[in-house]
Swiss-Prot record:
Function in brief: Nucleotidase that shows phosphatase activity on nucleoside 5'-monophosphates.
Compartments where found: Cytoplasm
The keyword Ribonucleoprotein belongs to this UniProt entry's keyword annotation: no
Record PANTHER family: 5'-NUCLEOTIDASE SURE, 5'_3'-NUCLEOTIDASE SURE
Enzyme Commission number(s) of this protein: 3.1.3.5
Protein name: 5'-nucleotidase SurE
InterPro entries: SurE, SurE-like_Pase/nucleotidase, SurE-like_sf
Cofactor note: Binds 1 divalent metal cation per subunit.
One Pfam family here: SurE
Cofactor: a divalent metal cation
């Protein structure tokens, strides 16, 4: 099996190294990740300048672009084979509910999915994450399962792991995405030169976090696995919008 790894925290991130080490006994692993932290880059592609691919002493490749750039470049321009799987992570912090829209971690996996490759995004639900070994073990188990029972169609899984020791994880739960309250307002401040600058506000707290959601599973010590899709069509409004457009 051949696996392409990426992330949005950068090629130097501990979560990426932990995942690469855990998967090495299971597959031929190639790492292509951003040269710096690109958290929140979502599915953006770099179109205004060329991309450069370099190799670090660790053997990991890094790109002066976004997580989506990394996977797109690797699959369509670097590798001489199509990976059997694309895995993105381990992210430092959760990607649940609305986070998935903004997440570079999820975006890297999404690009693999759009290129027809089974893909997994994995996040450790704590920005000061400690138990990367737990998340790596979860992903290794998923890879073995997918090896033994390959999906019949391209699959995109969003995995969130509680930041705790393996023995303290209560199990795995297949979930739907929850929802957050709206984000906090931007923070207005000044830089050392007295110029007004703004920082994007914090993400909103969980709003829809009931049983069956990713928020609920992780809060209760379970690994959350949410199958994702790309069709954003709101089918329930098609008739009402059609009626609204009639003269």
């Amino acid at each position: 099996m051949r696996i392409l790894l990426s992330n949005d925290d950068g090629y130097f991130a501990p979560g990426l190294a932990a995942l690469a080490e855990a998967l090495a006994p299971l597959a031929e692993v190639t790492v292509v990740a951003p040269e710096r932290d690109r958290s929140g880059a979502s599915n953006s592609l770099t179109l205004d300048r060329p991309l450069m691919l370099r190799q670090a002493p660790s053997g990991f490749y890094y790109v002066n672009g976004t997580p989506t750039d990394c996977v797109h470049l690797a699959v369509t321009g670097m590798l001489d084979h199509l990976p059997d799987m694309v895995i993105s992570g381990i992210n430092h912090g959760a990607n649940m509910g609305d986070d998935t829209i903004y997440s570079g971690t999820v975006a890297a996996a999404t690009e693999g999915y759009l290129l027809g490759i089974p893909s997994i995004a994995v996040s450790l639900a704590n920005h000061n994450a400690l138990y990367f070994d737990t998340a790596a073990r979860v992903v290794s188990d998923l890879v073995r399962r997918l090896q033994n029972n390959p999906p019949t169609e391209p699959t995109l899984l969003n995995v969130n792991v509680p930041d705790r020791a393996w023995d303290a994880v209560r199990g795995i739960s297949v979930t739907r995405l929850g929802k957050r309250h709206k984000a906090e307002s931007v923070v207005k401040t000044s830089n050392p030169r007295g110029q007004t600058v703004y920082w994007v506000g914090a993400a909103g707290a969980a709003q829809d976090a009931g049983e069956g959601t990713d928020f609920h599973a992780v809060a209760n010590g379970y690994v959350s696995i949410t199958p994702l899709q790309m069709d954003l069509t709101r089918f329930s409004q098609m008739e009402s919008v059609t009626a609204w457009l009639k003269p």
